[in-house]
């Protein structure tokens, strides 16, 4: 098994695998300031809800490092500003808000200590978030493996692997576990337009792991489902409402509709940190809209005519009634979702 480490905090620098460059180039993006982390999240150097949360936590550590020599009052003001900036890097993934909330809580708790002690406390919390995510992913993988039958053909969307987390992955983590437990699985990976996370990232991870797979255009998925060639669908999540409505990469909703028509099990794999206990339904989830160039260009080359308008939401919401279950580190949540989600609070 090849270990993929999405990020590493070492000697006061956060090193991120630059996911914009994969699969053609394996490079690291160095973050030395919280502004670097803000940019990395916005520009999708790092992406995937759990990975964004962990990166933002280390962004807070970098902010403390930046302002270490400031007087306490200015230090705390600058830290509050950094927390606010990082919390707004991307709007849809709740793990970002969750991680910043944890870092803010630590800062509030230790604000009367020396600046150097505050820095150490923040670094300790960021490290906790990192290692908790890794452990959570491995727990989800083992739990999720229970729903994978031997010789299963699995369809997945976007990237939910090690690159979307600090390591191992969510939905792709379940796939990884099924493969290494000898279940002889086969994977179809959607290319996932417009950013092509499936083609660039998931396909790369599958090749690295030696997992049998084929890459498909997004428009092929419905035909495979109709023809009975898919046994189960596994996707990730960026935010889950109390009723089970799930925001995930654009195109997920479409898959869920076809899966429901043809009675194919449709599972969301996400840590409980992705559940937003403050919203009732998916209607309350803010959907990020991204640059038109993501649709009109590929790798900087224009593929659409000048003058055409573009609608480019990064996510859509899959209604809870289309979801078979939500696989978390605490077990599989099944309908009625609201009742069972509240038990985890």
From Swiss-Prot:
Its EC number is 5.3.1.23
Which Pfam family, an example, fits this chain? Answer: IF-2B
* Residues annotated as binding substrate: 47-49, 90, 197, 248-249
Q: Entry's Gene3D superfamilies?
A: translation initiation factor eif-2b, domain 1 (1.20.120.420), Translation initiation factor eif-2b, domain 2 (3.40.50.10470)
| Site annotation Transition state stabilizer: residues | 158
* Molecular function as annotated in GO: S-methyl-5-thioribose-1-phosphate isomerase activity
Which reaction equations make up its catalytic activity?
A: 5-(methylsulfanyl)-alpha-D-ribose 1-phosphate = 5-(methylsulfanyl)-D-ribulose 1-phosphate
**Function of the molecule:** Catalyzes the interconversion of methylthioribose-1-phosphate (MTR-1-P) into methylthioribulose-1-phosphate (MTRu-1-P).
The cross-references to PANTHER family, in alphabetical order and at most eight, read: METHYLTHIORIBOSE-1-PHOSPHATE ISOMERASE (PTHR43475:SF1)
Q: What is the name listed in the Swiss-Prot or TrEMBL entry for this protein? A: Methylthioribose-1-phosphate isomerase
Whose protein is this, by species? Caldanaerobacter subterraneus subsp. tengcongensis (strain DSM 15242 / JCM 11007 / NBRC 100824 / MB4)
Lineage, opening ranks:
Bacteria, Bacillati, Bacillota, Clostridia, Thermoanaerobacterales
